[in-house]
Amino acid sequence: MPQLDKFTYFSQFFWLCLFFFTFYIFICNDGDGVLGISRILKLRNQLLSHRGKTIQSKDPNSLEDLLRKGFSTGVSYMYASLFEVSQWCKAVDLLGKRRKITLISCFGEISGSRGMERNILYNISKSSPSNTGRWITCRNCRNDIMLIHVVHGQGSIK
């Protein structure tokens, strides 16, 4: 596209506006574009308001419940992945012992102390929306954070 000068300015501006508004109408007014999403969200808010709930609830107890559920879900995913890693390491270690080959050079296991747990839980509760820390306590989550597996590296297969 040539530089804007006195002779081509109007035609470039015309084609720019024509393409811009064509794509704007095509993207936003097809029902699935930006305007379509806003219509869907408005309808969803109306339907939920009839049930007595809204999407953006201002109730701090419901926010704490959501945070508690999210934290427990994250911990369960972490445990599931760590369990799979430990099972894989045990299987590879047995395979290596049978063939006299060391496949894993270093496998570390760090046991979290209660002081570290309290520090983690304190930092998480400090960042809660209500800033009271009621949504997470050491009694409920002390047994959730006990063991962290760290795979440091792999050796070469000989």
UniProtKB/Swiss-Prot annotation:
Enzymatic reactions: ATP + H2O + 4 H(+)(in) = ADP + phosphate + 5 H(+)(out)
Membrane topology reported for the UniProt record: Single-pass membrane protein
Keyword ATP-binding applies: yes
Keywords (A to Z) from UniProt: ATP synthesis, ATP-binding, CF(0), Hydrogen ion transport, Ion transport, Membrane, Mitochondrion, Nucleotide-binding, Translocase, Transmembrane, Transmembrane helix, Transport
EC number annotated for this UniProt entry: 7.1.2.2
UniProt GO molecular function: ATP binding
Enzyme superclass (EC): translocase
Keyword hit for Ribonucleoprotein: no
Gene Ontology, cellular component aspect: mitochondrial membrane; proton-transporting ATP synthase complex
Family designation: Belongs to the ATPase protein YMF19 family.
Assembly with partners or alone: F-type ATPases have 2 components, CF(1) - the catalytic core - and CF(0) - the membrane proton channel. CF(1) has five subunits: alpha(3), beta(3), gamma(1), delta(1), epsilon(1). CF(0) has three main subunits: a, b and c.
Function noted in UniProt: This is one of the chains of the nonenzymatic component (CF(0) subunit) of the mitochondrial ATPase complex.
Protein's name according to its UniProt entry: Putative ATP synthase protein YMF19
Organism name: Brassica napus
